[in-house]
């Protein structure tokens, strides 16, 4: 390889990947992206995909608008993008940081994409209390760890974390 070639983070030797991810800092970044989604006129949800070395590989805001796509959840859209562009060897070492707990649909997408870990802010239960019966967010109070427990492989779940920060983004957004 030429001296100037920069290898992607996932090509580093395993012993260099032993660093500890700063889960709070990375979750704050996802929560900040949810603020940007809301400022852009969309629902206040976002997530980031992080490689084993802490590099943010992809960012995704909620994609409900402009087409009113009820399946346009940030996590589901990000998993479609990731699973069609990144190698499986990379995905199995990645973590998704998401402003709110993945719903059943998004947890399924995360599972089938093959991610290692989920870190989330607000629980589905708390989100349901915030959004009420808003027709654009019919929340399922079904924790993602239950979805993952039904699978054939383990997905590590960390959360809820930074709940107050994650909830603050939703103030006044749902009615």
Language model segments and positions:
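Helix-adjacent hinge/juxtasegments
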Residues: 80-113
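Extreme N-terminal basic, low-complexity initiation segments
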Residues: 2-8
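Conserved beta-strand segments that form the floor/walls of ligand-binding pockets within enzyme
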Residues: 44, 95-99, 119
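Short beta->alpha transition motifs characteristic of CBS
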Residues: 57-64
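A short, polar/charged loop-to-alpha-helix boundary motif
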Residues: 66-76, 81
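Zinc-dependent deaminase
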Residues: 10, 15-40, 109-175
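Short beta-strand scaffold segments in enzyme catalytic cores
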Residues: 45-50
């Amino acid at each position: 390889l030429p001296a100037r070639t920069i290898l992607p983070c996932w090509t580093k030797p395993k012993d260099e990947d032993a660093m500890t991810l700063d889960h709070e800092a990375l979750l704050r970044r996802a929560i900040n992206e949810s603020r940007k989604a809301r400022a852009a006129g969309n629902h206040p949800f976002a997530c980031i995909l992080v490689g084993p070395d802490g590099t943010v590989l992809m960012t995704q805001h909620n994609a409900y608008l402009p087409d009113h796509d009820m399946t346009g959840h940030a996590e589901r859209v990000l998993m479609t993008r990731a699973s069609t562009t990144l190698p499986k060897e990379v995905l199995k070492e990645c973590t998704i940081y998401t402003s709110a707990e993945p719903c059943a649909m998004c947890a399924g997408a995360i599972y089938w994409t093959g991610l290692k870990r989920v870190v989330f802010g607000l629980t589905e239960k708390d989100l349901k209390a915030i959004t009420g019966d808003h027709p654009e967010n019919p929340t399922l109070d079904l924790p993602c760890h239950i979805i993952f427990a039904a699978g054939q492989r383990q997905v590590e779940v960390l959360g809820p974390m930074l709940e107050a920060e994650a909830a603050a983004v939703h103030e006044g957004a749902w009615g």
